[in-house]
Every structure is written in C-alpha cells, then in structure tokens.
Amino acid sequence: MSQPQDRDRRRLISASLAAGGLMAGGSMLSIEAGAAAKHKINMQLGWLIGGNQLGEVVAKKLGYFEQEDIDFQIQPGGPSIDGVAIVASGRFELGQVSSSPSLMLAVSQGLPIKCFAVGIQKHPYCFFSLKKNPIRNANDMVGKKIGIQSTGIILLRALLAKNKIAEKDVTIVVAGADMTPLMTGQVDAFTGWQTNTTALNVLGDQRVDMRLWDAGVKLYPLPYYATTETLAKKADQLAKFLRATGKGWEYAHANREKAVDLLVKEFPNLNRKDELDAAPVMLDYAFNANTKANGWGAMDPAVWKEQIDLYAELGQFSKRVPRVDEVMTLEILNATGAARPRIG
C-alpha cells in the first residue's frame, strides 16, 4: 500500500477555482425523493489509487453502489493534480485527502468545501526508530536527527509544540520516502504511515513506532469532503455513497483476502502480497471502539477543534482561522447512522 502525499500547503488555491458561484446553501439536510436514474459520483483522490480505497473498490465490485442507484468512479490524484481545487470547482462530486489539515487550510483560504466523514479513525502517520536507539515518546526526540519528507515538517513542528519541545532541540533532515537513512544511521527516526507495510519491511523486528496521534497531535486521516453546495443540494446522494462505502468496508473487515482479490482485480498494477500485508493494518484503523459505538466513518467535532487550535498556534492560517462548523458537518453521518457498520 502506498503512502498518500497531499502537499497540504501547495496549490490549495488554484487561480481557476471557479468557486465564485459555489455559495453555501441552507444548513438543513436536503433529501431528494427517489430518482430513477443513477447518480454519477466521482471521488477525486489526492494520490494514486491503492489499498486506502479497499472499501470503495469492494462496494463497487459487489454492487453496493448500484443498489443505491450510484454510478461510482474513483479519480486518481498524483503530484500534478490538485484534488481539493478540482472538487471545489464543482468538476467532481466529492473527494478524499490524506489528512484533515488540507481541508482546514483550504477552508481558511475561502474554498467552499466541508468534511462529512472520515475513512479511518486515527492517523497512521508515525515516527519509526530502531530498538538499539528507540524513540518511544516525544521527549525521546530531544537531541535526535529526524528524517522527514518536506510535506511532513509541519507535523513534526505540531508534535514538538504539543509537547512543549523547542524546535532547536531536534535536527530535521529532509529526505525522501526510502528508509535507508534510518537503516544506515544517518537519522535516528524516519517518518511514514504504518499502513505502508511494504516500505516498512526493511526494518524487520527492530522497528519501534511512535504514532503522531499518541504523541498528542490528533489529525483525521482520509477525510471525505464535498462542496457546501453539494452538501446542501445533493445530501441524499452523499448519504447513499456513505451507506454503500460503509458496507464495502464491513465486507473487507470480514473477508480480507477476498476484498484484496477484488482490489487487485480492479487495479492489476497493485501487488497482491503487499496489499494482503497492508489490509489488516488499514482495517484496524478503520474500525475501533469509536466505530463500534458510532458507526464506520464517525468523527468528533472536539478533535477538529483541537487540531484547528493547534494549527492556529503554529501560524498556519495565513488569512483567518476557520470555525469547526465551517470545516466539518455531522449531517450526512446522522442521516446514515442506522446503516453504517458498528464494528470495533
């Protein structure tokens, strides 16, 4: 499974946003009555397609979207594609980014988008070290060299701020995605997603993990978002999408090998063994105590408030600090509460 990179702060605002006409509609959930024709829903990603879309692919292959009268397609992202701007322009119906800060920053810049559910519950972004020189908590970072991608530096800064550690007490080494600097001792820790099991194999049983979430920086991974206009006028379609997708993730949880086979059949470029290794890790993030209580896709406004406050403290909002209700809504989750799987 590959690690998505959203370039949180780059090209959030495209000059061609075409968002001038996308005005927020009423706050009440609008449910359209039974249209016979299938609703076309394109989900724009911020990265190339992989195991992060296991549930969506299962839902498509098993006909769950068709049962909801949805013609569903996944639109891949990549380094030259600004998925947030594409969705904000109205070209596609919804999108998914790797991490919630992308949406917070976009809203602060005036893009009319809002999160309506999350794909997994806790962020798998992690600082990896080795047992011979372990980093098990934030304080262990003091005096250490941290290998990190340029897009992740803000996450390290957030972790340090949350734990009241001066940035000068840590050496930042900008690196790519390869774990070699950690294995050769050039750095003491290296960053990545725990779901990226293929890249982590090289660390073997010497691996020590410290999750960003456990260190106090609680960001939501794989948030689903749509424009405020879509939320106001096509809430029924988003609810159908969420019901079908939830069923797909539920099937994947109960039938992991079959789910991976469906994924690889849909996208033959993926490696079956790699996806089989990654699926259990991903599913452990998709379902936990919160989903058992509140259903797959659930999220907490208090977590959003905490991350907005932290990013404001770090000076990340160049225009204004967005309100929680501007960044996320529970309306689609509330409308699908009885249908979303409660597994944990």
Predicted regions and their residues:
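Conserved C-terminal helix/tail region of periplasmic/extracytoplasmic solute-binding proteins
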Residues: W304-G344
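N-terminal export signals
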Residues: R11-E32
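Short, glycine-/small- and polar/acidic-enriched structural segments
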Residues: A36-T184, D188-Q194, D205, M210-R211, ...
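Residues that mark the N-terminal boundary/hinge immediately upstream of a DNA-recognition element
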Residues: D8-R9, N137
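Secondary-structure end/capping motifs
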Residues: A232-Q316
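Secretory targeting signals
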Residues: M1-R7
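A residue-level marker of the well-folded mature domains of exported/periplasmic proteins
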Residues: I74, T171-I172, T180-A189, L200-D209, ...
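Periplasmic-binding protein-like
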Residues: G119-S129, N201-L231, L242, P280-Y285
